[in-house]
Amino acid sequence: GFLGGDGNFTRVLGDGSFWVPVGQVGGDGNPGGGIRFALGLTLRAGAVFGDAGAFPFDRFWMGGVQFGQQLRGYDETTVTPLGLYPRRSAEISEIDRLGDAFFSLTAEYAIRLSDQLGLGLFYDAGGLWRDPSEFTPQNLYRGAGVGMQIVTPFGPLGLDYAYGFDKASPGWKLHFRMAQGQGM
């Protein structure tokens, strides 16, 4: 490229959120007052077209909440184009955990107790594929749970407790977030 790069690929990302207020308790009807309730839906998708093999940080990871695409109920980076693999598994190389296409959705019922504190119930679903042409909505991994978020002077902190439905041993996973997460 004209900036000295050797890559010949295009990375496309898209996301959208839709939130609907569904009620308020207290606050005398004033905006931002009392306890507020909302329903939200967030969709995210991304794809890499071309050869990004030499550029792993332009490809996608999925699972957990800290790296790559969020999917609560699963350990970090355990959702792969080849299926679910535990971290440090000898059955898959780290580079094979990356995909060139992903899709995720989150449905959430959020409860804002104040401008600094929120609670929520959520349902996440997502998938990761080697190639955008492999995308199929029938192969999404699912998680659901409860979460809380507090806004501090250092940024938002969150705690989510999520159930991963599609793991070899389905079960609960605790996630700690140190950045802006889903909704709430």
Annotate each language-model stretch with its function.
Residues E134-M148:
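A short alpha/beta connector and helix-capping loop motif
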Residues A162-K167:
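A short, acidic, flexible beta-alpha connecting loop/helix-capping segment that sits on the rim
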Residues G1-L113, L121-A125, W129-D131, R177-M184:
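C-terminal outer-membrane beta-barrel translocator/porin domains of Gram-negative envelope proteins
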Residues A38-T42, G118-G120, G147, P156-D160, ...:
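Residue-level detector of the transmembrane beta-barrel scaffold of outer-membrane proteins
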Residues G64-V65, G73, G143-G147, G155:
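Glycine-centered small-residue hotspots that permit tight backbone geometry or close packing
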Residues V146-P153, G171-M184:
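Outer-membrane beta-barrel "beta-signal"
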Residues L113-D115, P153:
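Short flexible coil/turn linkers enriched for glycine and charged/polar residues
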